[in-house]
Amino acid sequence: LIGSTLEHEGFDKTTTHAALGSLKASAIELLPELANAEPIAQWAGLRPGSPEGIPFIGPLAGFDGLWLNCGHYRNGLVLAPASCQLLTDLLLGRPPIINPAPYSPVGRLHC
């Protein structure tokens, strides 16, 4: 498994030769023995984010029982422990670890 890229292509998940070339060059720089290796597969996905760059964490108004924890853009893995703790605290009615207001979908997400 070698790295990741970021391309602003809307909802197009097509892989590109440019991205593959960049990833391969980075891998060879770190481990020259990979120079003759050929990729087995290439994959592309989406990195959904919010317009403000702040994830949506909390209940979605108008949809009883629907809670969100999304919109982390490229920081999903890094923020997962804290955002899941916040969501868990909110769901269970416990005092949250941080102020949940900035993350609330209320007033920020319109369905």
Positions of predicted regions on the chain:
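Active-site lid/adjacent beta-loop-alpha segment flanking the redox-cofactor pocket in flavoenzymes
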Residues: 1-63
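C-terminal lid/capping helical subdomain adjacent to the catalytic/cofactor pocket in oxidative enzymes
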Residues: 60-111
